[in-house]
Amino acid sequence: MSFILTFDIPRELASERKHVNLSLRKMNAKMVQFSVWEHENLSDLIKVAFKIKSVGGSARILEEKFIF
């Protein structure tokens, strides 16, 4: 089962965005679109989401479910 992390980090926090993207790459998450990443480990994504929220960004984690 996969999970999707979507997030938004304010432009003035570009260094934080770089750090988040690097963290996601290191955990082998797959970039679907800018600020939309897919990964199978929910707890890893939750850690990243908390980091994003702690710097003033917004983050959501969705469970991927293929319907058709």
Where are these regions (language model features)?
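Short glycine-aromatic motifs
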Residues: L24-A29
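Short acidic, Gly/Ser-rich segments with clustered Asp/Glu that frequently serve as metal-coordination loops
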Residues: E12
